[in-house]
Design a protein with these regions (language model features):
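Secretory/organelle targeting and membrane-embedding segments
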Residues: 1-163, 167-513
Length: 513
């Protein structure tokens, strides 16, 4: 498998192309997309001839647009903007602007004319990526306008669209969105981006499992007791209150990010390491998720909402005090749930998923708890020893750690757990790419491995939809409140069904964990 991974990772050629960003004046474009493209440029990963067209509603000249982007690079680019002013200037020469009202059909006719002009002037083939950095309710409108003017046609070059989550608001709306997109774009033209899958350390879960002979043989129900997946955020909803109150944690985090991480952790080895084989195996996991019946929701899902709390001698707002949030909102900002994957590898092994806002630290990790040795020879001699763990830290301070028992030096046989860890920061010569850098480059070369396929989207919605519907229908299902800077409602520990078990509380700095 290791050789297969090495062969498949050889760099594909990046063809000359045009990238159109709808919503180019928005936060996502300024903070993430344009800095990522600039970093690819600094790393010499972009083709010789390329153009980036910002498509925004504001009226402004090319010069003003380039000045705006230069300021964004200086503020948000990781490296390079201040250190390489000449590089920044040469990058800006590839950036253009066209005023587009996304709801105006005529503006897309003008966009088509502008693309044709740039293609001819710059000698760039009509290989085009359309990035939908816009509110989801505009996806179908923009796609329809592109189709109307033939901007989806591939006779003169390939065309691809990238859409951000959420991919629908429910199973039915996801199916409807796909139907409308597919009226003019094939599945292999649609790239559904999930930036979690673009994280280097999420991708490394597959390499950790499938290229190491001492991990994969124990990655199953015979040796694994349980799996924990945590994605905690220290901040509240901030300025996203209006969006969040209609979405909630289940739609914002569980349905996409964390179920995708679960799929990577639980999937079978693909026969070959290519896009379709990997996605075939990951979707099988999502399709094997055991449905949670309405009568089982309270025992398997805990939802919470943060409340006003005094933190470090300052009052931190509760969720209901956030701007755009209803004063009696029952929207969840925390979820902990127990999930089962009903297949041969994982039958009856619980996966515990936890995510929330206003928690003590911003941490994302996967913890594989192994079963104890069949005979506890040193049970009476242990000093705070727990079962063995494999900890896959996704962020921050990314790395992998193995937690196991060792004898304390000195007389007798006292045993305690120690940590053997690898940290990505130790690879000083290798920079960890930002998720959007990797994902944009993958789309440019036509690699959809790390993008969500429609069957995976449908499978994840099919799993969470009944829970959301029951919450809406049944007000008696509890919504627990928790203080900011805590690990959520204490009721989340009841999911383990064992008073001796509780959620792992990770440190922000993995090296002290």
């Amino acid at each position: 498998m290791e050789e297969v991974i090495k062969r498949s990772s050889r760099k594909n050629p990046v063809e000359n192309q045009i990238l159109v960003i709808f919503g180019s004046n928005g936060d996502l474009a300024k903070r993430k997309l344009l800095p990522a493209i600039f970093q690819l440029y600094l790393d010499d990963l972009l083709p010789e001839r390329f153009a980036v067209i910002g498509a925004g509603s504001q009226e402004k000249s090319e010069d003003v647009n380039r000045l705006d982007i230069a300021n964004s690079m200086l503020e948000f680019a990781k490296t390079g903007a201040e250190e390489n002013p000449d590089k920044l200037q040469s990058f800006l020469e590839h950036v253009y602007y066209q005023q587009v009202n996304n709801q105006s059909e005529e503006d897309f006719g003008l966009l088509k004319t502008y693309i044709e002009h740039l293609s001819a002037t710059l000698d760039i083939p009509k290989n085009i990526i359309y990035y939908f950095s816009i509110p989801p309710f505009l996806y179908e409108t923009v796609a329809a306008h592109l189709i109307k003017y033939g901007l989806n046609a591939e006779e003169d070059g390939w065309k691809r669209i990238i859409i951000e989550k959420p991919f629908g608001y429910s199973y039915d709306t996801a199916v409807e969105l796909d139907k409308n997109l597919r009226s003019g774009f094939n599945e292999d033209q649609i790239y559904r981006i999930d930036h979690y899958l673009g994280k280097e350390t999420v991708q490394n879960i597959m390499v950790t499992r499938f290229s190491n002979g001492f991990f994969e043989p124990i990655w199953n129900r015979k040796y694994v007791d349980r799996v924990e997946i945590t994605a905690s955020e220290k901040i509240g909803v901030g300025t996203r209150g209006g969006y969040y109150d209609s979405s909630g944690t289940m739609r914002d985090m569980i349905q996409n990010h964390l179920l995708q991480v679960l799929a990577v952790v639980a999937m079978e080895p693909p026969s070959i390491f290519d896009s379709e084989s990997i996605r075939n195996e990951s979707v099988k996991v999502l399709q094997a998720l055991r449905p949670i019946k309405p009568s089982e929701i309270s025992q398997n899902v805990v939802r919470g909402q943060y409340i006003e709390t005094m933190v470090d001698e300052a009052i931190q707002k509760g969720y209901r005090q956030e701007k755009g949030v209803a004063p009696n909102s029952r929207t969840e900002t925390f979820i902990a749930m127990k999930v089962f994957v009903d297949n041969w590898r994982w039958g009856d092994i619980p996966f515990y998923i936890r995510t929330g806002k206003c928690l003590p630290d911003h941490v994302t990790e996967v913890v594989i708890h192994l079963k104890p040795a069949p005979h506890q020879l040193f049970k009476q001699r242990c000093v705070a020893q727990s079962t063995n763990m494999i900890i896959l830290r996704i962020s921050p301070d990314a790395g992998v750690a193995i937690d196991f028992g060792m004898k304390i030096p000195g007389a007798g046989y006292k045993v305690q757990n120690v940590n053997m860890a690898f940290h990505y920061s130790d690879l000083a010569e290798n920079k960890i790419s930002e998720a959007y850098e990797r994902l944009l480059l993958d789309c440019m070369i036509g690699d959809s491995t790390l993008y969500a396929r429609i069957d995976a989207v449908k499978a994840s919605w099919k799993f969470v939809d009944p829970i959301l519907q029951e919450w809406k229908k049944n007000p008696d299902i509890p919504l627990y409140f928790y203080e900011c800077n805590t690990w959520g409602p204490k009721e989340a520990n009841a999911l383990f069904g064992n008073k001796e078990l509780k959620w792992r509380a990770p440190f922000k700095k993995f090296k002290t964990d």
